[in-house]
């Protein structure tokens, strides 16, 4: 998954529930897109929608301002070379891509997006605008934050639902039709396997892992002796690497997925 964690249910189970609630078709996003950052995730999602002859794309966002999203996307397309030049300059300061993107957008048009659903929503619109896809984007207001612990009626964030499920708190059933006979697997259950792999691999081998940025292999080696998954992620997280980025790379290490010749990043 995009957040670098395992899905709590397989595709067929989730598809079945969607169909029960009136969805006509459900498409599975390729692994190469589903486990990437927002811009690549969105590219894959919109491409899949186009191939399915979808002409309206509906998504949730916190600000619910689709006109602003189109304005930003069109500005980036018109000033693409300058935009990426500014992004590269910001990245050299040792900050994450998301933060660099925020700063550049504020410079270019005086607006930026910082909330999780807004960021993904912008990437959907960017994919539509950049490729001139015949798709209309429509936004729905998110009433609960992506990581929020608060609930609104029967609506809760994905993060909060996952927390309830893994705490074996049956209150999760108020917010999702999913039911579990046994506890879903979690990536932290595989931390010892991850440690063995990192300890066995040399720096050059780690560099070949998909999404492994320059210097990250040394960071992994430095902190691999930490006893818990949470401690390792916290130690590796910085201004440059978000926790989600670290988790995604950990997933690729576990699956031993190497960088392709045509990188998606």
Regions found by a protein language model. Name each.
Residues 29-265:
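Active-site cores that bind ATP or allylic diphosphates and position pyrophosphate for catalysis
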Residues 17-21, 211-212:
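A broad, low-specificity signal for short, low-complexity segments enriched in glycine/proline
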Residues 1-14, 20:
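N-terminal catalytic cores of NTP/NDP-binding nucleotidyl/phosphoryl-transfer enzymes
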Residues 11-14, 18, 59-60, 161:
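Short, charge-rich amphipathic segments
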Residues 20-30:
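A glycine-rich helix N-cap at a beta->alpha junction
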């Amino acid at each position: 998954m995009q957040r670098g964690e395992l899905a709590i249910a397989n595709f067929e189970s989730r598809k079945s529930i969607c169909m029960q609630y009136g969805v006509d078709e459900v498409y599975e996003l390729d692994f190469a897109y589903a486990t990437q950052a927002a811009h690549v995730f969105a590219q894959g999602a919109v491409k899949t929608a186009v191939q399915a002859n979808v002409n309206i794309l509906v998504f949730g966002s916190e600000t619910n301002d689709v006109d602003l999203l189109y304005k930003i996307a069109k500005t980036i397309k018109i000033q693409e070379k300058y935009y990426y030049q500014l992004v590269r300059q910001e990245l050299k300061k040792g900050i994450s891509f998301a933060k660099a993107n925020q700063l550049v957008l504020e410079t270019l048009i005086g607006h930026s997006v910082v909330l999780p659903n807004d960021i993904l929503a912008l990437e959907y619109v960017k994919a539509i605008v950049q490729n001139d896809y015949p798709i209309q984007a429509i936004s729905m207001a998110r009433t609960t934050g992506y990581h929020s612990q608060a609930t609104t009626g029967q609506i809760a964030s994905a993060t909060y639902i996952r927390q309830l499920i893994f705490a074996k708190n049956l209150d999760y059933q108020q917010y999702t039709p999913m039911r579990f006979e046994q506890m879903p697997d979690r990536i932290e259950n595989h931390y010892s396997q991850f440690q063995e792999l990192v300890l066995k691999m040399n720096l050059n081998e780690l560099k070949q892992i998909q999404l492994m940025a320059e210097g990250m292999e040394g960071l992994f080696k430095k902190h691999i002796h930490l006893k818990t998954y949470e401690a390792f992620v916290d130690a590796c997280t910085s201004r440059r690497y978000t926790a989600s980025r670290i988790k995604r790379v950990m997933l690729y290490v576990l699956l031993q997925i190497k960088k392709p010749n045509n990188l998606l990043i």
